[in-house]
A protein has these predicted regions:
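Short, charged, surface-exposed hinge/linker loops at domain edges
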Residues: 1-2, 36-74
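Short aromatic-glycine-(Arg/Gly/Cys) micro-motifs in beta-strand/loop hairpins
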Residues: 6-21
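Well-ordered beta-strand positions in beta-sheet-rich domains
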Residues: 2-4, 25
Length: 74
């Protein structure tokens, strides 16, 4: 399964959201932390175990937005 993670640089940090999962969004002071928090939320909302391998691929950048692809087996 492949889903998008959108990370946006804001004035006070970074926000991350997964548009395909309702209410799956987070905020952090740095990019790595917001990615980690969003991955944890994806695991929760998609009912994935901690052992499920997830690859994070930086796909593209558009202005202040960075699009990542989260790749995992469901």
């Amino acid at each position: 399964m492949v889903i998008d993670l959108v990370v946006t640089k804001t004035d006070d940090g970074y926000t991350g959201e997964v548009p395909s999962l309702k209410d799956c969004e987070s905020w952090a002071h740095n990019e790595d932390d917001v990615i980690d928090k969003c991955v944890e939320l994806v695991r929760f909302y998609a009912n994935l175990s901690d052992e499920t391998e997830m690859k994070i691929d930086r796909a593209r950048r558009s202005g202040k937005k960075i699009i990542y692809k989260l790749i995992f087996e469901k």
